[in-house]
């Protein structure tokens, strides 16, 4: 087998099968032009989608000579790109909504960018099965960002046994030059979770350069300390069987005996290794899965490779400023984020689902120097303070509750972190303080109607509509228990006033996690009620009463044949029906983070609706997608607002010339990378790929591969060197691509 397969991005003009397919010409583009104001400040990234559990790195993403900020969010493995922009002497970040498309699709659990081969381009380290996977940065200013899978899994010599270099999926290791020889070594907690292992990169010693990733375990107790198994307490100068003191020449592995106690599964730790005191050896910041602080360990040595011991520990780091207390499982990241040439410290939690998720990026500004940093607390919401950000699973809803003719913005959520009871679901309120043509959303209240105090469970889902005939919208809430709450609008002026809740509204109970929408579905000029429920269907309650006295009667328990099926038994559909040019459409958000777009609804309420696009616009938002569609700025173009797992909102605008009633022939786009490749190739498409076949130039089938998404990585380790064709036989079109 030849480990090198040559890839060429060339789309052939021949098509094996003419599978002409017509799809709606319905395109939206990201647009952040509507301002959002909070506490008197205009937000810089209002529509950037939010942040939950961030890991930060830097990368010259666009090869323009400066470092851009790359954010990996452990909440469903999402990537955000903030490009470094320079205008005169002013430096700033600009959110790139499409930046994640140029990263490998299999980045999981963690992502760290660092230049392992000293070519001036940061490479990508992520999770491999039980360890570390590495992509080499093969891009340039001409071809753009490209990645080559360099190592599917890093290996290390464990005292004569060559095994996968173990790093728990929960952990963030320190990938850093420990010994000062310019190649990147790895510090990581052992599988027992109490000692830090030092895996030395032997590239420089073996080959005289840094472009290899060959590791040897040199120390099972680097720094000579132990972290307690039942807490995050640190024992310095550990005298246990794994640890020794004294010099370790060049270094050599200390004498190691098997621990008497049985190793326990490692729960989770984060490491940042930095020389804080310019002593020549690395110190540590350690985060633990069950705690909100960082332990700062200072190294008492002055020369690398001498097995120097950690001599002090500060559990209140930074003790000279506001000590970190960030629930839960904080990681620390060392990079310059304010463009002054000095690396700052960012901290963010990593316990998915149980950590702080609204004010979850603490920034400590470096007011010292590069060699002697001095970290001073600046904010607990770096980037987040400039976004719409409301925990996990944001849901955008518009309603004019101030009776001024301008739609206001409400953002519900699945839950937000709460220190006492851990989570709460609530609704934020942004008043529209602009005009019809130029809306401006101004933050008013993080907990509209104090709903978080009502103990309504997870994921309260609002919908507004006039149910009394007075022109003012009432509020209906869908609840976790499957029932609805009704809040009458009692306002007589410009301020929203809602009366006491009516529980179990009209006896409606859909089981669990009711997601209601008030909408005149049958065009009889009275509002009907569509309710999504946890398992994936929509229930249609027709208004058989009047506009001022509605009676909602169940007509269809599986409206349109819609049944949201995801990777779990739960669909969590969030229905949003809307009307454009007197035609009804539906977009459905769901647990899988994708959006389903339906048409053929009018005159077909008893039939199965047509699934026109899935996933709509190719968007994959991690989980809990939610949509709202309306022409908010009255420019005769629809706006699309998308809620998502990370607690913020994306805003998109209908493309000029794109018309929902028109159709055109659209071929899916298919791209391949890297070029060349040694092991795998990633296929990206604008449609779900389905079956992919690898053919040689004689037409012989070399490999069949099934992919149920728009992005797949195909292993080519058993493919001989040569030129190949990829045939995509999935709908809507067959295509041949030369490899």
PLM feature segments, named:
Residues 592, 685-690:
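Short proline/glycine-enriched turn/loop motifs at strand-loop junctions of beta-rich domains
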Residues 694-702, 724:
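Short, glycine-anchored, charge-dense loop/turn motifs used at functional sites
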Residues 24-660:
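Beta-propeller-forming repeat regions
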Residues 669, 701-719, 732-733:
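Glycine-centered tight-turn motifs at strand-turn-strand junctions
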């Amino acid at each position: 087998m030849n480990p090198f397969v040559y890839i060429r991005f060339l789309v052939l003009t021949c098509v094996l099968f003419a599978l002409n397919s017509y799809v709606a010409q319905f395109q939206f583009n990201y647009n952040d032009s509507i301002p959002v104001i909070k506490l008197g400040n205009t937000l810089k990234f209002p529509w950037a989608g939010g942040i939950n559990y961030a890991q930060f790195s830097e990368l010259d993403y666009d090869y323009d000579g400066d470092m851009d900020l790359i954010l990996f969010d452990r909440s469903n493995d999402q990537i955000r790109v903030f490009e470094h922009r320079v205008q005169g002497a002013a430096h700033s970040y600009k959110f790139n909504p499409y930046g994640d498309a140029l990263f490998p699709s299999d980045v999981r659990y963690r992502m760290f960018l660092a230049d392992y081969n000293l070519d001036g381009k940061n490479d990508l380290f992520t999770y491999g099965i039980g360890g570390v996977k590495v992509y080499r940065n093969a891009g340039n200013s001409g071809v753009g960002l490209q990645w080559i899978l360099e190592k599917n899994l890093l290996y290390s010599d464990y005292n004569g046994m060559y095994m996968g270099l173990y790093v728990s999926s929960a952990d963030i290791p320190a990938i850093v030059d420990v010994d000062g020889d310019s190649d990147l070594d790895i510090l990581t907690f052992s599988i027992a979770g109490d000692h830090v292992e030092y895996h030395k990169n032997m590239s420089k010693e073996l080959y005289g350069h840094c472009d290899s990733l060959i590791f040897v375990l040199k120390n099972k107790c680097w720094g000579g300390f132990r972290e307690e198994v039942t807490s995050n307490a640190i024992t310095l100068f550990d005298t246990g069987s794994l640890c020794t003191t004294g010099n370790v020449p060049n270094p050599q592995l200390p004498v190691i005996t098997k621990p008497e106690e049985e190793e326990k599964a490692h729960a989770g730790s984060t490491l940042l290794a930095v020389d804080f005191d310019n002593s020549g050896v690395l110190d540590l910041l350690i985060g633990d899965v069950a705690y909100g602080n960082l332990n700062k360990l200072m190294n008492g040595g002055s020369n690398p490779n001498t097995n120097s011991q950690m001599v002090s520990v500060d559990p209140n780091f930074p003790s000279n400023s506001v000590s970190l207390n960030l629930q839960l499982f904080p990681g620390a990241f060392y990079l310059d984020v304010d463009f002054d040439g000095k690396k700052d410290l960012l901290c963010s939690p990593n316990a998915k689902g149980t950590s702080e998720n609204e004010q979850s990026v603490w920034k400590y500004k470096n007011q010292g120097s590069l060699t002697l940093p001095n970290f001073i607390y600046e904010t607990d919401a770096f980037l987040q303070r400039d976004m719409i950000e409301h925990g996990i699973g944001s849901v955008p809803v518009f309603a004019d509750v101030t009776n001024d003719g301008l739609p206001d913005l409400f953002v519900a959520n699945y839950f937000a972190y709460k220190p006492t009871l851990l989570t709460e679901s609530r609704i934020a309120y942004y008043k529209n303080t602009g005009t019809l043509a130029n809306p401006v959303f101004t933050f008013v209240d993080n907990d509209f109607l104090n709903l978080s105090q009502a103990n309504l469970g997870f994921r309260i889902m609002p919908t507004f509509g006039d149910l009394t005939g007075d022109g003012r919208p009432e509020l209906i809430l869908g609840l976790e228990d499957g029932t609805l709450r009704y809040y009458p609008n009692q306002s007589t002026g410009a301020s929203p006033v809602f009366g006491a809740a009516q529980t179990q509204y009209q006896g409606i109970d859909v089981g669990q996690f009711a997601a209601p929408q008030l909408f005149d579905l049958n065009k009889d000029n009275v509002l009907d009620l569509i309710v999504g429920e946890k398992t994936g269907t929509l229930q249609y309650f027709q208004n058989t009463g009047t506009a001022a006295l509605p009676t909602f009667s169940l007509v269809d328990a599986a409206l349109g044949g819609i049944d949201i099926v995801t990777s779990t038994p739960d669909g969590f559909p969030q229905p949003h029906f809307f009307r454009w040019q007197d035609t009804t459409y539906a977009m459905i958000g769901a647990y899988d983070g994708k959006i389903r777009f339906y048409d053929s609804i009018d005159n077909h309420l008893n039939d199965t609706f047509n699934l026109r696009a899935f996933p709509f616009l190719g968007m994959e938002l991690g989980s809990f997608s939610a949509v709202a569609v309306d022409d908010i700025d009255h420019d005769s173009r629809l706006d699309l607002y998308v809620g998502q797992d990370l607690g913020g909102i994306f805003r998109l605008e209908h493309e000029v010339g794109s018309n929902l009633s028109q159709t055109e022939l659209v071929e899916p786009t298919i791209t391949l990378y890297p070029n060349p490749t040694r092991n795998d190739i990633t296929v990206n498409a604008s449609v779900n790929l389905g079956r992919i076949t690898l053919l040689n130039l004689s037409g012989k089938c070399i490999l069949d591969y099934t992919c149920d998404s728009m992005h797949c990585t195909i292993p080519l380790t058993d493919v001989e060197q040569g030129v190949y064709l990829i045939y995509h036989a999935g709908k809507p079109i067959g295509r041949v691509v030369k490899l």
